[in-house]
Amino acid sequence: MSNKTITIFHNGEELSEKTSLCMKEKLEARGYLVRDRFDDDTDLIVCVGGDGAFLRAIHRCDFPNCPIVGVNTGHLGFFQDVLPSALDQFIEQYESGEYNLQELNTVRAIVTTVDGHKHTHLGLNEITIKGRRSYSVHLSISIGDQYIEKFSGDGLLFATSAGSTAYNYSVGGSIADPRLNVLQVTPIAPMNTTAYRSFTSSILLPADLSLGVIPESRENRIYLNNDGFETPYNNVKSIEVRVSNTSVHLIRLKGYDFWSKVKDKFL
């Protein structure tokens, strides 16, 4: 019998609800305390659904320190290692310690407005900076203390290695092995004309290097999106983006291989 506390989240879909209930019954039969809310004493988070549900759970729990495991009832499922048909097998492996913890790095953006206020955002997959709908955005970019370019286009995407297979990949970014602690900067529909010159491919930065973004003075509205959570800003003075010290602890079962999953999902 166990005295551990486990929190189960699901995405509300019928299969996810059934799988969550089945998992709850199996865990309670083994003595676990199971609930549908996160508290500081939670020992494990089980997220049932797809990658979107996983990201929402991470943000809902404010990037928790406890391990989290994904049960895949969605489509892509890069964060999920457990199938609904293998719940008993997972519980046995969890109890016997037959798993690894994968540390997933996060990306952080600090937005400073002209009135001096600072706002911090974290992303497990990515953070994007865009302008108003259907408008190009013009951003001065510096890496470290070095000015690099004035970007013009739909926006910029800052991806972690774990997030490199998500939105980043769909806009032409590179797939990065999650064991690499890097920040990938990918342009979204960059302009490349005689009037505007921008990088048209991704840039990879080491984790200890920050990137600065300054919107042009005429840009009166910026949209920052972290993992699908959008925040509009007016009067932005600057934005600092870098790899965060916060990480997510994802359970990976024995036999997990990132590149095998890439092959299964994309090829």
What are these model-derived regions, one by one?
Residues 2-39, 77-156, 165-267:
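Catalytic phosphate-donor-binding core of small-molecule kinases
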Residues 40-46:
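Short acidic/histidine-rich motifs immediately flanking catalytic phosphotransfer sites
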Residues 50-53, 74-76, 162-164:
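Short glycine-rich anion-binding loops that position phosphate/pyrophosphate groups of nucleotides
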Residues 65-67:
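Proline-centered loop/turn at the N-terminus of a beta-strand
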